[in-house]
């Protein structure tokens, strides 16, 4: 089957490193991962052949492939990785981004291109994500580690819905920040804010990908 006829989520799982390519093209491989690559490219007027070539090159060369194959890792190892690499990182990222955003809004609020509203949106994401991470760490992940797979089914569905909501919140951030593209004369804080938001989005998308496309399906398929 050609890459064009595969879902974004399937490609993100089968080709480690593909997530980086998808982010470059602003292709949603986590919350919108059920869309075929061909359809997603058409929706955004992207060059499908170019994307397929990059995926082929990545698959063949394994260049930049430092991603572990989580499809066969133990649940405990995967969960510990998610908490250490993503949960803890998000808790560090968001307060700093809020501080930077407040500075930019306070100093440049009179400019037409100032991202007014990004502080409130980041605070919303921080509040909701903090609750989400806590529920995973205190309820869902212990269930999975203890092998209570049937009980984990409903919490997983709730987490997936919250992932969708987080994806929608990210789209609002992109809209407010011109897809995280600072103006040519942006100050250091403005540039640092957008760079930090981009990093946060990269991390969040990969975080959701690991759960939605690998961890959760594995648990739901347990007999």
Swiss-Prot record:
Subcellular location: Cytoplasm
GO cellular component: cytosol
One matching Pfam family: ScdA_N
Origin species: Haemophilus influenzae (strain ATCC 51907 / DSM 11121 / KW20 / Rd)
A GO BP annotation: protein repair
Function: Di-iron-containing protein involved in the repair of iron-sulfur clusters.
Record-stated family: Belongs to the RIC family.
Name of the protein described by the UniProt record: Probable iron-sulfur cluster repair protein HI_1677
Main location: cytoplasm
Molecular-function GO term, any one: nitrite reductase activity
Swiss-Prot/TrEMBL keywords: Cytoplasm, Iron, Metal-binding
